[in-house]
Structure formats: C-alpha cells, structure tokens
C-alpha cells in the first residue's frame, strides 16, 4: 500500500478542522516520471525477496494507475487482474465523489501462484470487486482509526486478500507498513507479517495495534527491551539532553 503521490491536505480530513501531516515521501511532490521511478524502485526491491509464483498486490488511486502499471512492466512482474475496492460511502472528490480504490494483482513469473479461491471450490466466493466499508463508515472506532493514519485500510479486506493467495505460515511482506494493517491481518490468519515503515510515528502505531490485538508485548531485537521499556529509555535520554541544553543556555 504505497503512498499515492496525492497530497493529504485537501484530500483527507479527520473531521472538523483537524488534518494530518503529509507523508514522508510521495505525498504529491513528485512528477509523474518521478513517481513511476519511485514505484519501480520499491517494487524491484520487494520482489528480490519473493519466490517465483508469489502474488504482488498494490493498492493505488485512479490518478496514478498508469505509473503503477508502467512500474510493474519495468520490473517484470505479470499483471493477472485488477481489483476494485468499493466503499460504502463516497469520500472527497470534484465532479464525482471518490468511492473506490484500485488494487493491482500481479505475479512473479516462473511458477503458478497459490489459489485458495478456485471459483468457490473451497467456499470462498471472491470476485475482483471488493465491497468493504471505508474509513468514513468503519463504525465506533472510525475516529481512532483516522487519528492513527489518514488512509488506513480495513483489516478484513487485507486479511481476505492474504487468505486468497497464501498458506498458513507463509511470509507476507509490506514495504509500506503504515499503521500496521497488514501485520494485524497476517496475525489474524496465521501468516507471518514482515513490515517496513520509514516514519517512526507509524512504527509506534503499528506496535501498539499489534499489542492490543494479541495481548503480547513487542521487544526490540537489539536491546531486548519491551516497547514500553524502550519508550521510557528514550524519554529519559531526551530529558537528560534537554536538561544539558538548558544548562548551557544559562551560561550564555
């Protein structure tokens, strides 16, 4: 779920006068060529860890579908379908209010992909139209979800997509981890989630959401500290540093 190169401000609102900060990268500042290059590079890195036959799902806004398709062609993965996420309500828009997002379904060539749908053979009736409530109709947790991330996706939708093309114990990689929806979805269907996220704020959100779901405590590998212990260590270090700065200022 990469950023769509669409500004957050003017396209996503929390409600009232509240707004979100822009994403670290691809938040409307890139040209078409730059964004295509961004997608090509990220997809290229991602598939270096994928086995042949692996399915690559990439969500995208209609504005930049062309750049995504060009990127998938450049890295040599085969598009096998295009799914449409249809939301319950329309969001922001100009001539028409946006009520859908797109999901490119590609495959790493060289082998058949896992297919857990098989035209309903296993009781899973799945089409390329995905009907799931958007964040504007998530329910009582809607505002909390939006506070966590401006473009949070429904966990159930990602969980179903994972179930379609993987087996228990498979590794699911999301190089744009965001608020951790893919990790939660993988946890719920007994897959192994592996996420990369550039923004520390969303890393913390992901860890909190995972802890809330599992009742477990995340630990940093290097220090073996729990997330809460690590936060306390960092806060203590910051307080000491701020105190040193204040003392230096007193002597100026």
Label each region the model flagged:
Residues 2-203, 251:
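Core catalytic lobe of class I
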């Amino acid at each position: 779920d990469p950023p769509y190169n669409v500004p957050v401000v003017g396209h996503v609102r929390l409600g009232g006068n509240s707004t979100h900060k822009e994403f670290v990268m691809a938040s409307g500042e890139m040209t078409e060529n730059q964004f295509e290059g961004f997608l090509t590079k990220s997809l290229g890195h991602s598939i270096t860890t994928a086995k042949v036959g692996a399915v690559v799902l990439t969500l995208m806004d209609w504005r930049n579908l062309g750049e995504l398709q060009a990127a998938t062609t450049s890295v040599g993965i085969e598009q096998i379908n295009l799914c449409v996420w249809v939301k319950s309500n329309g969001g922001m828009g100009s001539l028409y209010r946006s009520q859908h997002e797109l999901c490119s379904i590609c495959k790493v060539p060289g082998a058949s992909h896992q297919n857990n749908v098989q035209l309903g053979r296993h009781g899973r009736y799945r089409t390329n139209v995905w009907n799931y409530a958007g964040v504007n109709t998530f329910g009582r947790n809607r505002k909390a979800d939006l506070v966590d991330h401006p473009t949070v996706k429904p966990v159930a939708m990602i969980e179903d997509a994972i179930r379609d093309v993987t087996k228990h114990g498979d590794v699911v990689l999301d190089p744009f981890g965001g608020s951790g929806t893919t990790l939660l979805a993988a946890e719920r269907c007994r897959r192994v989630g592996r996420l990369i996220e550039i923004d520390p704020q969303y890393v913390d959100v992901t860890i909190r959401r995972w802890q809330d779901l599992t009742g477990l405590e995340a630990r940093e590998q290097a220090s073996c500290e729990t997330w809460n212990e690590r936060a306390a260590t960092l806060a203590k270090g910051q307080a000491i540093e701020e105190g040193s700065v204040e003392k230096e200022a007193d002597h100026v």
